[in-house]
Amino acid sequence: MAQFDVHRNAGRHKDGIPFVVIVQSSQFKDYRRRVVVPLVRADAISPVRFRSFNPAFTIKGVAVVLHPLEIVSVPTERLGTKVGSLADSDQIIVDALDELFSRAWK
């Protein structure tokens, strides 16, 4: 389970949120939980106002949008199967998370 791996959402909201992406650093790989950001179906979310905060991806033919405001920690055993990786888009994801934690809007 590496940073930016994409897993199926095995939870009860899997219809609208089919996937999650692991965002926590591999430094914490021995911890039994993973910090993930939901990848919400593009057709199940209101129009995106900030593309840099909610970048779009296609996973297994499904158009999804990163939803950093729903970031969560889940036990590793609750993650579904790995279906891919967004490591090639790592900077896009980190930039979205930087916006979430920005102090520029005090």
Language-model features and meaning:
Residues 1-7, 42, 82-85, 100:
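Short N-terminal helix-initiation segments at or just after the protein's N-terminus
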Residues 3-6, 10, 14-56:
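Compact nucleic-acid interaction/catalytic patches
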Residues 57-106:
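C-terminal terminal-subdomain/extension
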